[in-house]
């Protein structure tokens, strides 16, 4: 007869409990021991099989490896949390810098929106090139007819980038990220301005209204798309319409080429030129776009403006990720090591 009585307890002991996982780094699990008793007086029917022994040994060793791996998982999770915190802190500094820059130059908002749109909508699905890659920063691209008048917006971001990079511990911000986050800040500024207007110009009440009923919580997915790569050369010409001269059909065709439709074209009206009312009047001439223009105009008259703001955020988020492979470790850095020998107890 073969006794594996000690095997089962050893298996159970290797299953990590929550407390053992927590203390894994301090008390690493010890290898288990499998004891077997053998009696010589066995008949053929009761005789043990070598395969049974190997299975028991394999199970015990496997559970031991699982327990040991818990310490590694704990370290990996801790590193991930540190990186998330680093990226979040850096992103907060970026937003604060852009907020201050836009607040001091509110007239630049329409150009910031168009700059982000024109940088992103160069995406070509067939070749998987273009997109929000910061290529619009190159002089040969920013000087194209469709980008006329956007120099001031780019110059503002250049100055903001100097401030941001000076305070960065994880490397300079990419132009691709900078341009899209500037558009986010610009959009938020228009949302807050609308709330203030609804409160008769009272800044405090308007800000409170936006905090209570606004769409600020809808930016989560956009914020996670952080770590875009910069292009090293301008995107090909002919991919961006001149919005002030293009027909509605041309606009629809361009939006369709990047996976967007009449609904998204309507909600992006503020990105197509400095005069949103004039742009919407043109878009309303198209029967496919008209219902969406009317829907968003009605939404903007409400207190919360939910339909308009949420759909705009969703569309901006999609545009800002076209063709990009996001580096989710961008802007992270090794944490400073603490010399415990110098600590005063």
Swiss-Prot record:
Gene3D superfamilies membership: 1.10.520.10, 1.20.58.1620
Entry protein name: Thylakoid lumenal 29 kDa protein, chloroplastic
Stretches that traverse the bilayer: none
Biological source species: Solanum lycopersicum
Keywords: Chloroplast, Oxidoreductase, Plastid, Thylakoid, Transit peptide
Principal location listed in the UniProt entry: plastid
GO biological process entries: cellular response to oxidative stress; hydrogen peroxide catabolic process; response to reactive oxygen species
GO cellular component terms, semicolon-separated: chloroplast thylakoid lumen
InterPro entries: Ccp1-like, Haem_peroxidase, Haem_peroxidase_sf, Peroxidase_I
Highest classification ranks of the organism: Eukaryota, Viridiplantae, Streptophyta, Embryophyta, Tracheophyta
Xref: Pfam families: peroxidase (PF00141)
First-level EC class: oxidoreductase
């Amino acid at each position: 007869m073969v006794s594996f009585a000690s095997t089962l307890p050893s298996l159970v002991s290797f299953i990590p409990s929550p407390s053992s996982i927590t203390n894994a780094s301090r008390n690493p699990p010890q290898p288990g021991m499998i004891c077997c008793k053998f009696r010589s007086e066995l008949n053929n029917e009761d005789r043990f099989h070598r395969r049974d022994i190997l299975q028991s040994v394999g199970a015990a060793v496997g559970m031991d490896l699982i327990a040991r791996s818990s310490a590694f998982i704990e370290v990996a999770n801790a590193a991930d949390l540190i990186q998330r915190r680093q990226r979040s802190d850096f992103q907060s500094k970026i937003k604060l810098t852009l907020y201050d820059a836009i607040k001091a130059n509110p007239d630049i908002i329409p150009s910031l929106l168009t700059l982000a749109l024109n940088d992103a909508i160069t995406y070509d699905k067939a070749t998987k090139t273009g997109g929000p890659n910061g290529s619009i920063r190159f002089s040969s691209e920013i000087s194209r007819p469709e980008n006329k008048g956007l120099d001031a917006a780019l110059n503002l971001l250049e100055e903001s980038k100097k401030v941001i990079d000076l305070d960065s511990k994880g490397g300079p911000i990419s132009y691709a990220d900078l341009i899209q986050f500037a558009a986010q800040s610009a959009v938020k500024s228009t949302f807050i301005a609308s709330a203030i207007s609804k409160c008769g110009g009272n800044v405090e009440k308007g800000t409170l209204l936006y905090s209570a009923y606004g769409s600020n919580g809808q930016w989560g997915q956009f914020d996670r798309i952080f770590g875009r790569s910069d292009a090293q050369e301008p995107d090909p010409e002919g991919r961006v319409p001149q919005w002030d001269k293009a027909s509605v059909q041309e606009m629809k065709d361009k939006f369709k080429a990047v996976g967007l439709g009449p609904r998204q074209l309507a909600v992006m009206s503020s990105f197509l030129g400095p005069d949103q009312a004039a742009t919407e009047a043109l878009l309303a001439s198209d029967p496919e776009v008209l219902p969406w223009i009317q829907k968003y105009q009605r939404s903007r008259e409400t207190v919360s403006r939910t339909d308009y703001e949420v759909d705009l955020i969703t569309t901006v988020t999609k545009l800002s990720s076209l063709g990009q492979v996001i580096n989710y470790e961008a802007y992270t850095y090794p944490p400073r090591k603490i010399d415990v020998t110098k600590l005063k107890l």
